[in-house]
Design a protein with these regions (language model features):
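Short, conserved charged micro-motifs
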Residues: 76-85
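N-terminal regions immediately upstream of nucleotidyltransferase
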Residues: 1-34, 38, 61, 81, ...
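Active-site nucleotide-donor binding segment shared across nucleotidyl transfer reactions
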Residues: 26-67, 72-77
């Protein structure tokens, strides 16, 4: 394993901090883009920790180089969410250390925030929505995300729920 990874345990308190950062970045995005705020501000289905960091939350041994966080929205009939949106944020000082690839730019670990809209309605069960999306493998994002793990960080009552891998669903 690379020394660039942190092997510190991710707690629910850590997930809450990451969720707060994601929420703040989301509001900043909508503030800069009122056209997207009109369509999507009230259509958030869930937010998930993904890829290696999520797998580390599940198994405790993968390690973390970056926290990948995805926000998923119920697709609006007028336009899909601009999924190319990609924002980097700073976790700040923490037990996870600093971003090894660019330590001068970050006080702590890097958080990469992405978002996309999915074929569902506001209020749909986020677990079912994500499992259906990942099982379908219809997009490159779905195929990439299902290779590791997804752990919900919003809505808060699902904080820490492991959506993927799911023992109840076939993995491919």
């Amino acid at each position: 394993m690379s020394e660039e990874r942190s092997f510190e345990r991710i707690t629910k308190s850590d997930l809450k901090k990451i969720a707060r950062i994601a929420r703040s970045e989301r509001e900043e995005f909508f503030g800069r883009h009122p056209e997207w705020a009109m369509l999507y501000r009230k259509r958030l289905v869930c937010v998930a920790l993904c890829k290696d960091a999520a797998l580390h939350f599940v198994n405790g041994s993968t390690g973390i180089d970056v926290f990948d966080v995805w926000s998923f929205y119920a697709e609006h009939a007028e336009a899909p969410f601009p999924f190319q949106q990609f924002v980097k944020a700073d976790l700040g000082k923490s037990k996870f250390g600093r971003d090894a690839s660019n330590p001068e730019a970050y006080e702590g670990r890097r958080i990469e925030l992405r978002a996309r809209s999915l074929d569902c309605k506001p209020g749909d069960d986020p677990i079912e929505v994500l499992q259906r999306y990942l099982r379908s493998g219809e997009t490159p994002s779905a195929r990439e995300l299902r290779e590791k793990a997804l752990v919900l960080i919003e809505p808060e009552h699902f904080l820490g729920y492991v959506v993927w891998p799911s023992l109840a669903m076939p993995n491919g």
